[in-house]
């Protein structure tokens, strides 16, 4: 396609599914802080007055899961009983077992480089030159809107804002380049006494306009603010939340393929996470080097086997090299065995909670080692 319209969405840290993601990654972080080789597959379910944490965890450390959960919920902003969900008084249930020995036998290896993949599957990484972060523009701007909403809420600049919110940005493309924002949808939970007219004006003037580039906004850009007219009841009171239910928000907003496995709550031996980071790392360096305008990488694995089953690069006709030549460069210069990915991207020492909101890719924090452009010379 050359001329088209494309939409991506983001959600706030107070969205039920994102609460679940953050709790799962908070548990993971606490374990890896004391046991870098801990094996974690942590799933979280949140609903009215209840948090259920389950999964398979093998570690030599102790973690007070209940306290981790309560701290994270209150940090997000659910610290008031009037919100209907409060980290200080909700019920917390934990149901954790050890990792299956049948799985562990395929992963455990004294030689870190030969650690087998934690499961079969394929992952995708993507990059394009639409934004400075080499991310697709719709998801990039949708995330920025949610960051702005959280900032105004936490700084008490708009005191009527509440933690739950969603954004959606639609861009019009010509010749595969974003030229204008067609519409912005933003729904935010709010105090019951704020008037709809005042809310709409504040969201447009304080959230949208300071965040989105003026050259992409125009007189016909449509602003759809809290379209139902009221969003007082939100968070887990309105909808239950589950870990891994926002995988498109977490990745590329639908602009690229997704292997299907979520990221949050998984230690880096799980290729759903570590290999997806590696695929982004490769794709970003290809685009960052100017070799291609767009690049999508697929890597696939078999459980218990270190080397990938397959590697494929797609540059959509924008590269100076063929897809086959690009793939050959990748396999020659990047070690995609899980153990080497973990070592080279320093995945045992990450703060994974930072990834659980506003996307795992396109971030400027040094914590996001897979965003480094330190391999561009390979592709020049």
Curated annotation (Swiss-Prot):
Organism domain of life: Bacteria
- Any GO MF annotation of the entry: magnesium ion binding
Q: Where is this region: Flexible loop?
A: 99-109
Task: Give the protein name, as stated in the record.
Answer: S-adenosylmethionine synthase
Keyword annotations for this protein, in alphabetical order, are:
ATP-binding, Cytoplasm, Magnesium, Metal-binding, Nucleotide-binding, One-carbon metabolism, Potassium, Transferase
Keyword Metal-binding in the entry? The reply is yes
Q: Biological process (GO) annotations? A: one-carbon metabolic process; S-adenosylmethionine biosynthetic process
């Amino acid at each position: 396609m050359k001329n088209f319209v494309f939409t991506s969405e983001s959600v706030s840290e107070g969205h039920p599914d994102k609460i679940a993601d953050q709790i799962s990654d908070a548990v993971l972080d606490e374990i890896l802080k004391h046991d870098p080789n801990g094996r974690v597959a942590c799933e979280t379910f949140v609903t009215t007055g209840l948090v259920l944490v389950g999964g398979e965890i093998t570690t030599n450390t102790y973690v007070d899961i209940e306290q981790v959960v309560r701290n994270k919920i209150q940090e997000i902003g659910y610290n008031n009983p009037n919100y209907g969900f409060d980290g200080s008084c909700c019920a917390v249930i934990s149901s954790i077992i050890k990792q299956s020995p049948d799985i562990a036998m395929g992963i455990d290896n004294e030689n870190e480089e030969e650690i087998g993949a934690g499961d079969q599957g394929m992952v995708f990484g993507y990059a394009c030159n639409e934004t400075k972060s080499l991310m697709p523009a719709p998801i990039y701007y949708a995330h920025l809107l949610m960051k702005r909403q959280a900032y105004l809420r936490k700084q008490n600049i708009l005191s009527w804002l509440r933690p739950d919110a969603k954004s959606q940005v639609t861009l019009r493309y010509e010749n595969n380049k974003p030229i204008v924002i067609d519409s912005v949808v933003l729904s935010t939970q709010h105090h019951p006494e704020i008037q709809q007219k005042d809310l709409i004006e504040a969201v447009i003037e304080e959230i949208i306009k300071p965040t989105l580039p003026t050259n992409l906004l125009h007189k016909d850009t449509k602003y759809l603010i809290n379209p139902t007219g009221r969003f007082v009841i939100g968070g887990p009171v309105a909808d239950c939340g589950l870990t891994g239910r926002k995988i498109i928000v977490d990745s590329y907003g639908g602009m690229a393929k997704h292997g299907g496995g979520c990221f949050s709550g998984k230690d880096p031996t799980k290729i759903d996470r570590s290999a997806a980071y590696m695929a982004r790392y490769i794709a970003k360096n290809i685009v960052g080097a100017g070799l291609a305008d767009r690049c999508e990488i697929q890597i696939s694995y078999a459980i218990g086997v270190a080397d990938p089953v397959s590697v494929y690069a797609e540059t959509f006709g924008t590269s100076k090299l063929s897809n086959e030549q690009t793939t050959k460069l990748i396999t020659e210069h990047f070690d995609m065995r899980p153990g080497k990915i973990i070592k080279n991207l320093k995945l045992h020492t990450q703060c994974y909670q930072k990834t659980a909101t506003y996307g795992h890719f396109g971030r400027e924090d040094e914590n996001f080692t897979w965003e480094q452009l330190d391999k561009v010379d390979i592709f020049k």
